[in-house]
UniProtKB/Swiss-Prot annotation:
Gene3D superfamilies: Aldehyde Dehydrogenase, Chain A, domain 1, Aldehyde Dehydrogenase, Chain A, domain 2. The keyword Oxidoreductase applies. It comes from Escherichia coli. GO terms for molecular function: 5-carboxymethyl-2-hydroxymuconic-semialdehyde dehydrogenase activity. Optimum pH is 7.5. This is 5-carboxymethyl-2-hydroxymuconate semialdehyde dehydrogenase. The active site is at E244, C278. The lineage of its organism: Bacteria, Pseudomonadati, Pseudomonadota, Gammaproteobacteria, Enterobacterales. Its EC number is 1.2.1.60.
Amino acid sequence: MKKVNHWINGKNVAGNDYFLTTNPATGEVLADVASGGEAEINQAVATAKEAFPKWANLPMKERARLMRRLGDLIDQNVPEIAAMETADTGLPIHQTKNVLIPRASHNFEFFAEVCQQMNGKTYPVDDKMLNYTLVQPVGVCALVSPWNVPFMTATWKVAPCLALGITAVLKMSELSPLTADRLGELALEAGIPAGVLNVVQGYGATAGDALVRHHDVRAVSFTGGTATGRNIMKNAGLKKYSMELGGKSPVLIFEDADIERALDAALFTIFSINGERCTAGSRIFIQQSIYPEFVKFAERANRVRVGDPTDPNTQVGALISQQHWEKVSGYIRLGIEEGATLLAGGPDKPSDLPAHLKGGNFLRPTVLADVDNRMRVAQEEIFGPVACLLPFKDEAEALRLANDVEYGLASYIWTQDVSKVLRLARGIEAGMVFVNTQFVRDLRHAFGGVKPRTGREGGGYSSKCSRK
């Protein structure tokens, strides 16, 4: 059986304890994974602290060269990494291979360039004096990364750190450890010096908690659940931190929208990446005059192909774990109990799966109609392939309903009225507003939200947590 250890100071370090990671589609055991704790974290942080001065003082062009080399190695190994990610997470292979892993490579290429352009500011005081600022790395950074799209998200955190001269300890979710292990290996192969990037496997309550509490960690970057994020903020002390937490993003579709395009984009926004994405458009608000037309949305949801994640034709694979499957399935049952109308999908596993997938964590794309915004399914993050359809009367009601939720990451507006777009973009409580399109990633712009989300990533924003 494959063993997954820690990467500390350039060495593959065995653990004292191990846990099994399994394929969510088949139940097959994939690897025996080291379960780190305080001892491994202390070792990794000490190593990162020791490596920091030399890495920080390495010329930026040399750091950029090593990062580009790492990006090239990822490109050369896309099929292998994508297959590993699909096996570990249940994500469809066409998404990991064609989108998510190539994006990870681009993260290194992008930040290698961006961070060479980061400079302080200079102000002439008079003809004899200048005031100037320096942009400097803070020291050791803790990177706590989630189980959904794990490789891409991990590289999104690692790349700006390396570019700025920061050393890091990466703690991946225990539900998706495999590709982080490969990242640690490829970083060394690319020539990243030992100790600059350390990867410690383990559980959040042990390895993760020890990492964010460590007195030599100067900054924490976390992506994950809101409850965990609040706990980290409480325990982080005076450290700088960036928190990318949950989402319950609204999609506002007005009667003057291009309905066919809106249907396709709304379908993609909620059901791609198995619905396990913080930017998922899970609350779809439809103007009353066109609400009956959205039976087409359920028809399209029923045509989404659910099945073997390794099949290139599969569009929705398996959810990350049995526990998460039970959570998402439970929300579907709850929505029906609360009075929503089930138009597609449902809380049970598909009955037409082949024998080797019968025990997998599969759910059909589910559409709940006639949802009231006060229902729990409309207020709480489900993090799965579940769309809630809600009617609205006019612009004012649409804005009120969209904002009436704890979360504020992304939002999506569909209308041909530019004035309406400008009003809504200003009034909607979301960090990102997409107009007449699904989520489109642009690394130059800030990624982040409002309300419980306190971080910004992308472009120069990614460095704000880890520079001084």
